[in-house]
Amino acid sequence: MELLQRTRKINKLLQEHKGIAVDFKEMADYLGSAMQSNVFILSRRGKLLGFGVNELLKNERIIKMLEERQFPETYVELLLNINETKSNIQIENDLSVFPSENADLFAQSNTVIIPIKGGGTRLGTLVLGRVDRAFDDEDLVLGEYAATVVGMEILREKHADIENLARDKAAINMAINSLSYSEKEAIEHIFDELGASEGLLVASKVADRVGITRSVIVNALRKLESAGVIESRSLGMKGTFIKIKKENFLEELSASH
């Protein structure tokens, strides 16, 4: 397959998603097929975002690593020291993606390390591995192009996460500001009582202990639930199950004093 055709297929992956995040597993599978290699797309900290492997499934340590979706910390540290593409790394090198304990099986293997960058920062690493053939210049061009595409997607996801956090913060603050003094006090006592982000609440017990009416607790919970901050479910005589939906709620509640 010519380089132009292979590059166009990566473009097609982007175009078909129409604003939805590109599936890194799909990207890795395509690269593995187009380049006839094992492919690993890693975050900066070594989390496995996507992979396409074949020969490496012969090794138990690799299988466990894929199941945990995390590369070893020592290997990730080595990757972060690589600031530009490093190609055709041999099995004897610590940067080889092939397991050294099976050096006899992978004696002719080659590894390529391609840093994934975006916005002036290191976002991750693209790792390629072949069992018995070196990578040529066309392979490296395609790999570097794929790394650029992955970097753009990681940045897009980061920006989306920031926007979601900002929306959640605004919703939380609006909900907190809608509470009366006694309702806010009731909510603080409720989560002190639970000692966690979810649990079973017996409103009458909290009301008696704190010295407020049960209706204050009920009203406070309704306001938070209508704002999408918590969810609650009545369990009859057992009480009410409460769960925080927006993870920064307790932090914002504490900061609102």
UniProtKB/Swiss-Prot annotation:
InterPro entries in alphabetical order: CodY (IPR014154), GAF-like_dom_sf (IPR029016), GTP_trans_reg_CodY_C (IPR013198), Transc_reg_CodY_N (IPR010312), WH-like_DNA-bd_sf (IPR036388), WH_DNA-bd_sf (IPR036390)
Coiled coil location: none
Residue ranges of DNA binding: 203-222
Transmembrane segments: none
Alphabetized UniProt keyword annotations: Cytoplasm, DNA-binding, Repressor, Transcription, Transcription regulation
A Pfam cross-reference name: HTH_CodY
Subcellular localization(s) per the UniProt record: Cytoplasm
Cellular-component GO terms for this entry: cytoplasm
A biological-process GO annotation: negative regulation of DNA-templated transcription
Ranges where the record places region GAF domain: 1-155
Keyword match Cytoplasm: yes
MF GO annotations: DNA binding; DNA-binding transcription factor activity; GTP binding
Function per UniProt: DNA-binding global transcriptional regulator which is involved in the adaptive response to starvation and acts by directly or indirectly controlling the expression of numerous genes in response to nutrient availability. During rapid exponential growth, CodY is highly active and represses genes whose products allow adaptation to nutrient depletion.
Protein's recorded name: Global transcriptional regulator CodY
Gene expressing this chain: codY
